[in-house]
Each structure stands twice: as C-alpha cells, then as structure tokens.
C-alpha cells in the first residue's frame, strides 16, 4: 500500500519511479455502481492514461478479462472471479513499470489463473518490476527470482525465492511441532 501510495508512511518517505499498477484487494479502485466499461476508463485515468490511450487498449483489456457482455453491467453484479478478471486485465494492459499483486490471484478458476501467470511472466520478461505478495510458496518459487519473508512487520529473510520459501516452510512446520530433516 505504501508503494501504491494508498497509505502514507508513519515516518520517512518513499520514492517510486514509474507507473504503479496495483491489485491490492478485490475491487479496489473500482466504483461498484459503474459498469465494467466505465471502470476500465476510470482505472486508466487514475493511472495517468488519456481516454484515447484507453480506447486503444480497451479491446485487449476485454479480450483478456473474457467477461463478455458483462463489461456493460454494473460491477456490483459481478462475481468475485469476474471482478478479479477485469482488475487484472486493466492493471496488466496499462504498461506499468511496477505491478503489485497482493494475494489477488486466489480467486478465479484454474485456466484463468494460468493465463494470469503467463501474463505476469511476459511482463517480467519485458522489464516490469513485479511485487508479488502471496502465501502460495509454489507460485512464489515459479514467478519470483527474489523473495522477502516478513515476520511481525520486520524482515526475517531476503534472498533467492527458493531459499526463502524453503526457510519459511521449515518455520511453519516447526511452529506446528513438526521437525523436518534438511
């Protein structure tokens, strides 16, 4: 939330360079009374894109979201999966420099999740910085090169994603009283 500037730091300052697109929570940034179409343009405007730029990206957004005629229905009528589809499509089609995905892919069906992971990989390959927040260690291992484990708001470990995931798993098992051989 600090990087996305939806929350102010209690002390110090944060400097962010580039366009930040953030999937922080389901429906964040959407006006539920607006249609999906209206929300696409609203989201683009919030991210600093002109209406002309959003018109040129609209077909890509709707094709990726794959919600059909629901694009012209109020977002409040959407299922959580439909809302996530549209939010993900908008945020990944606006050429972000930094993309924040905070547990947002936990909704939606498996084929769409797979489509999202392919899109994330494409964005990473294009040089987009991805800040991916998840408790799904398999996904962290497959998408992230580096990982940060926070415990009580403080850095517990920072390093290669596979090493951090392994240490976190070991910690979780030990918390449950299970000892693992290393």
Predicted feature residues:
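A short, proline-enriched helix->beta-strand linker immediately N-terminal to the Walker B motif
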Residues: 92-101
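Conserved H-loop
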Residues: 136-142
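ABC nucleotide-binding domain "signature motif"
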Residues: 10-20, 155
């Amino acid at each position: 939330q600090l990087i996305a500037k939806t929350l102010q730091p209690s002390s110090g300052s944060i400097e962010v360079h580039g366009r930040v697109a953030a999937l922080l929570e389901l429906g964040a940034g959407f006006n539920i009374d607006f249609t999906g179409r209206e929300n696409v343009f609203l989201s683009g405007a919030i991210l600093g894109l002109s209406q002309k730029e959003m018109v040129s990206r609209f077909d890509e957004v709707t094709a990726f979201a794959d919600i059909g005629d629901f694009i012209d229905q109020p977002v409040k009528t959407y299922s959580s999966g439909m809302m996530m589809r549209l939010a993900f499509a908008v945020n990944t089609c606006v050429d972000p420099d930094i993309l924040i995905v905070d547990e947002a892919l936990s909704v939606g069906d498996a084929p769409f999740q797979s489509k999202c992971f392919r899109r994330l990989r494409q964005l990473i390959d294009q040089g987009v910085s991805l800040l991916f927040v998840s408790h799904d260690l398999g996904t962290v291992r497959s998408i992230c090169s580096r990982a940060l484990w926070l415990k009580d708001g403080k850095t517990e470990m920072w390093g290669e994603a596979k090493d951090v995931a392994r240490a976190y798993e070991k910690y979780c098992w030990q918390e449950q009283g299970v000892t693992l051989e290393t």
